[in-house]
Amino acid sequence: MELTLASRDALTELINIGYGRAAGALSELTGYRIMLEVPQISLHEIASIGPMLEDILDGRVASVNQAFTGSMSGNALLLLDESSAIALSRLLSEDRSVDARLDSNAREIITEVGNILLNACLGVFGNLLRVPVSFSVPMLSVDTIPAILESVAHRAREPLQFGLMIHTRFRIKTGNVTGYMVIVLGIASLDRLMRELEQWEQRQMQ
């Protein structure tokens, strides 16, 4: 299955709305002006996502994982390599003594960033596509990409066959941090998403 140009444009618009809401919430929370650049979105079979992410994200990766259920089900993840997660926590923290490792303070910051970002994007899907979903409590893990994806697949309610990879860049003060949001879905949930995107596009043209 591939994204049509229209579906990619619609997804980009929806995710961008979610990013705008997340950036506003993060800016209010931290007191800093935070921007999230327009996302770049691609769809891949789950078997190819692991190797692609391993090429992009070096070594151990900080992952904030949030399962969602409802008319569509799957998992949404915010992925940052460890150095990027540390850099992001430093940019967002008033504590200049943040260690050169993901200590408890840094983990708390990254978990909250993931919670805000993932909730904003999944909430847009629910509200604008009219597909209500409920979310689990976000979970942070620091591990390799294969271990993270294996854990997600093990807990999934249906076989996860596809993933939307969403390139994410945070702009905060003088710093930029790059990561990825990945939404993994089974075939039935992906079909539902594509149908709802088409209907949303039709409503926009009315």
State where each predicted segment sits.
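Composition-driven recognition of glycine/serine/threonine/acidic- and proline-rich low-complexity segments
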Residues: M1-Q206
